[in-house]
Structure formats: structure tokens, C-alpha cells
């Protein structure tokens, strides 16, 4: 596992959940002796939707909705076998999407 890097990309709609998940990942990696870079906050993606309230007339009557997607990036440099095992056993919140890549 030497000279490798694990890149973990987290995505969630709630910033509290994603911050809690990144804190758990960083703490687990540091406890097992790996070097951690991050968490790096990536730009938040904002999607806005405008919906007409009235089905027929009154075009001025509209509702606007927004979905914010928060992103974080964590790099684990020189992970050990204990680090990989601990990360595999880690149980994160259901609202957090995790993508892991080895490089």
C-alpha cells in the first residue's frame, strides 16, 4: 500500500451531515497512522427551480425552490492496511454519498 493515495469525495444536501462524515473519516485515518490532507470544501452546487403556482392564469404567482449540493474532498496519503480496514468498517450517515478512488 506504500506510495498510494486514497481520494474520498463526499456529496450531501445537508452540510451538517457531510461535516460529521468528514470528521469521522479524518479521525479514523489519523488514528490508524495515515497522513490526511483535507477536508477540502469544494464549491457548493446550487440548482434553482421556478414553478408556477396557478395551473391556468396568474403568471406572476410563482414559487422558487433551491437544492444545494455540498461537496468535500479528503486525500489519505500512504494508507496502511489498518487504515483501509477501518475505513471499510466505517458506518456513515445515509444522506452522504461517498466516492472512493485509488491513485
From Swiss-Prot:
One cellular component (GO) term of this entry: cytosolic small ribosomal subunit
Entry keywords, A to Z: Ribonucleoprotein, Ribosomal protein, Ribosome biogenesis, RNA-binding, Transcription, Transcription antitermination, Transcription regulation
GO annotation (BP), single: ribosome biogenesis
Keyword flag Transcription: yes
SMART domains assigned to the protein according to its UniProt record, in alphabetical order: Ribosomal_S10
One Pfam family hit: Ribosomal_S10
Xref: PROSITE patterns: RIBOSOMAL_S10 (PS00361)
Keyword Protein biosynthesis in annotation: no
UniProt-recorded Gene Ontology molecular function terms: structural constituent of ribosome; transcription antitermination factor activity, RNA binding; tRNA binding
HAMAP family membership: Ribosomal_uS10
Family assignment from sequence similarity: Belongs to the universal ribosomal protein uS10 family.
Role description: Involved in the binding of tRNA to the ribosomes. Part of the processive rRNA transcription and antitermination complex (rrnTAC). The complex forms an RNA-chaperone ring around the RNA exit tunnel of RNA polymerase (RNAP). It supports rapid transcription and antitermination of rRNA operons, cotranscriptional rRNA folding, and annealing of distal rRNA regions to allow correct ribosome biogenesis. In complex with NusB is involved in the regulation of ribosomal RNA (rRNA) biosynthesis by transcriptional antitermination.
Record note on quaternary structure: Part of the 30S ribosomal subunit. Can also form a heterodimer with the transcription antitermination protein NusB. Binding of S10 to NusB is mutually exclusive with its incorporation into the ribosome. The rRNA transcription and antitermination complex (rrnTAC) consists of RNAP, NusA, NusB, NusE (this protein), NusG, SubB, ribosomal protein S4, DNA and precursor rRNA; S4 is more flexible than other subunits.
Official protein name in the record: Small ribosomal subunit protein uS10
Amino acid at each position: 500500500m506504500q506510495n498510494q493515495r486514497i481520494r474520498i469525495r463526499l456529496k450531501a444536501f445537508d452540510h451538517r451531515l457531510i461535516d460529521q462524515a468528514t470528521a469521522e473519516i479524518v479521525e479514523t485515518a489519523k488514528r490508524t497512522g495515515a497522513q490526511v490532507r483535507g477536508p477540502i470544501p469544494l464549491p457548493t452546487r446550487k440548482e434553482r427551480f421556478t414553478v408556477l403556482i396557478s395551473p391556468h392564469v396568474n403568471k406572476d404567482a410563482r414559487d422558487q425552490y433551491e437544492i444545494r449540493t455540498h461537496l468535500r474532498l479528503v486525500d489519505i496519503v500512504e494508507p496502511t492496511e489498518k487504515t483501509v480496514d477501518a475505513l471499510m468498517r466505517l458506518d456513515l450517515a445515509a444522506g452522504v454519498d461517498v466516492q472512493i478512488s485509488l491513485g
